[in-house]
Every structure is written in structure tokens, then in C-alpha cells.
């Protein structure tokens, strides 16, 4: 066994002194392609000089070995180069930077689209606010008879603070009496009543609107209660009729029970009615007994039998 250092790397050679065979060298250090090729040429020249008779047989072996050595050395060199150079961190960052630049270019190239999107968002917000304001106006109209009435009740300040109309007892009494006479007022009546009560015409109109709404609501509640009572009565009557129908069906299925049943209705009369009915019966019975004459001495007609008719015919023939 021998060791040799050519200056290109540490190499080990295994050989046998007795048998003159080509030695197998193991390269333990990463070598460059030029060093490996030079070492391979040196080894090949040495083997050719020492053993010229076995060139043909050994050439194939050296070719396979050289190809394997070249592959392994190339892989090692690539790994070593990557290790020495380090990891390329800027590769992914460059791709991300390219994507960011493309996005910025797209935004810069289409300013009209950005402006249109912003204007569309503002338009949507304006529409939503307008819808909310319309709903609030409808709610105020349904509660107090319209926004105009609320402004008039506030005193025309327009500050948005709603104040309930306060009426004195005399004003409320006059309004109630007028409402009993006329549930609706024409413009002349409205102005006259407002001047009489020291109110505005719009306030009088709103009061009448609210009073009509309350009256209608009360009337609806009364009608609902009446209909509810009618529905309860009809339900009870229907239940009773269903019970009678079921009883009649049971009687129809069992006819032998008719004899044992009591009459469905029994009539009772008061004593005075019984005396009147008994006296009327006696009065009608007395003339019938007096007016029937009895005939004495006249034989009652008798019915002839067929045998008597035959005997009479025989007697007349003799």
C-alpha cells in the first residue's frame, strides 16, 4: 500500500507488489476538472509505460472509471461552488419586486379606473344616505301627520327639535266639540277655528288628522272584539252540532235503541195555560154531544153477504 501527494489533493492508491496490476486510486478531496483530467492522464501514461501488453484490456476499465470520476468530481465541484458562493437570497426578492413594479405600473397606467371607482363609491354612499332620509321622513309623516306639521308645531324655527303641541282645557274642549260635529274641515272652517283658538291652521289640521286616526283605531279594536265574540259563539255552536251529528249517527247504527230513548224535547205548560186548554176542550165537546140526534125505530142498514144475495135470487125465481 502506498501514499502519494501530487499537489492536487490527497489520493490513496491500493496495489499489490507481487501482481503488476493497475492500482485503484481514491480521490478524497474535491478537485477541479482540470486537476482530475491531469491526474487521469498522468495515471494513464504511467500504466502504459509500465505495462504495454495490457493496454487494450485496461483501456475500457479506465474509460468507465474516468467517466465516473468526472461525474462525481463535477457534482462535488457544483456543491462546493454553491456552498462557497452561498445561497442566492436575492432571487425570490427580485421576483417579488417585479410583481410589485407591475402592480404599480398597472395602477399608474389606469388612473381613470381608480377615479371612477372612487366616484362610484361616493355615489353609492349618497344614495344610501338619501334612502335613510326618505325612510325617516316617512316615519315622521306617519307619526305626526307630516314634516310640515312638525315644523309648524316647532314654531317655524327649523332647528329640528320636535315639541308636542300643548293645548289648554278650553282649546281641547272646543276641538272635541267641533270634531263631533264635523270630522273634516274645509279651509274656511279651519282658519276660523285656528283664529278662535289662537293657533295656526296647520296645527288644527294635524290635530284633526291625529284625532281621526285615533277614532279609526278605536273603531277597529271594537270591530275586532265583536268579531272575536262572534267567532267564539260560532265555534261553540259548531261543536254542539257536531256532537248531535255524532249521536244521530250512533242511533242510526243501532236502531233497537229507539224504544229505550227518552223524547228529545218535552213541553211543559203553566197551570193557567192548562186551565184555559181544559175549559176550551169541554166547550167543544158539549155541542158535539147535543147536536147529534138519535133516530129511534129505524133499522140500521146491514151489509148483505153473498149467501144472502143467492138466497134472495132463488126465492124470486120460484
Swiss-Prot record:
Q: Which GO terms describe its molecular function?
A: DNA-binding transcription factor activity; DNA-binding transcription factor activity, RNA polymerase II-specific; sequence-specific DNA binding
Q: Segment Leucine-zipper: which positions?
A: 227-248
Q: Which UniProt keywords apply?
A: DNA-binding, Homeobox, Nucleus, Transcription, Transcription regulation
**Induction (UniProt):** By transition from light to far-red light.
Q: Which SUPFAM superfamilies match?
A: Homeodomain-like
| Biased amino acid composition, Low complexity | 8-17
The residue stretches assigned to a coiled coil in this entry are none
Indicate yes or no for the key word Transcription. Answer: yes
UniProt cross-references to PANTHER family, sorted A to Z: HOMEOBOX-LEUCINE ZIPPER PROTEIN ATHB-4, HOMEOBOX-LEUCINE ZIPPER PROTEIN HAT14
Q: What is this protein called?
A: Homeobox-leucine zipper protein ATHB-4
**Species for this entry:** Arabidopsis thaliana
Gene name tied to this protein: ATHB-4
Amino acid at each position: 500500500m502506498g501514499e502519494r501527494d501530487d499537489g492536487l489533493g490527497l489520493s490513496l492508491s491500493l496495489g499489490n507488489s507481487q501482481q503488476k496490476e493497475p492500482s485503484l486510486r481514491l480521490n478524497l478531496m474535491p478537485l477541479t476538472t482540470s486537476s482530475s483530467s491531469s491526474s487521469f492522464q498522468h495515471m494513464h501514461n504511467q500504466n502504459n509505460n509500465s505495462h504495454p501488453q495490457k493496454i487494450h484490456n485496461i483501456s475500457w476499465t479506465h474509460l468507465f472509471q474516468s467517466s465516473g470520476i468526472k461525474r462525481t468530481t463535477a457534482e462535488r465541484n457544483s456543491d462546493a461552488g454553491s456552498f462557497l458562493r452561498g445561497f442566492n437570497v436575492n432571487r425570490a426578492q427580485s421576483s417579488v419586486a417585479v410583481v410589485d413594479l407591475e402592480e404599480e405600473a398597472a395602477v399608474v397606467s389606469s388612473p381613470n379606473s381608480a377615479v371612477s371607482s372612487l366616484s362610484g363609491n361616493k355615489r353609492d354612499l349618497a344614495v344610501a344616505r338619501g334612502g335613510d332620509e326618505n325612510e325617516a321622513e316617512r316615519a315622521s309623516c306617519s307619526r305626526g301627520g307630516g314634516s310640515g306639521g312638525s315644523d309648524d308645531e316647532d314654531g317655524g324655527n327649523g332647528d329640528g327639535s320636535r315639541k308636542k303641541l300643548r293645548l289648554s282645557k278650553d282649546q281641547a274642549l272646543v276641538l272635541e266639540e267641533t270634531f263631533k260635529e264635523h270630522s273634516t274641515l274645509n279651509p274656511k272652517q279651519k282658519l276660523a277655528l285656528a283664529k278662535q283658538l289662537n293657533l295656526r291652521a296647520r296645527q288644527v289640521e294635524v290635530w284633526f288628522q291625529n284625532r281621526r286616526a285615533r277614532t279609526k283605531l278605536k273603531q277597529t279594536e271594537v270591530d275586532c272584539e265583536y268579531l272575536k265574540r262572534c267567532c267564539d259563539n260560532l265555534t261553540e255552536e259548531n261543536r254542539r252540532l257536531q256532537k248531535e251529528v255524532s249521536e244521530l249517527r250512533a242511533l242510526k247504527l243501532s236502531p233497537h235503541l229507539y224504544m229505550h230513548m227518552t223524547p228529545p224535547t218535552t213541553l211543559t205548560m203553566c197551570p193557567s195555560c192548562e186551565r184555559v186548554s181544559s175549559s176550551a176542550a169541554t166547550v167543544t165537546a158539549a155541542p158535539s154531544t147535543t147536536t147529534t140526534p138519535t133516530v129511534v125505530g129505524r133499522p140500521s142498514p146491514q151489509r148483505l153477504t153473498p149467501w144472502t144475495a143467492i138466497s134472495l135470487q132463488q126465492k124470486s125465481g120460484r
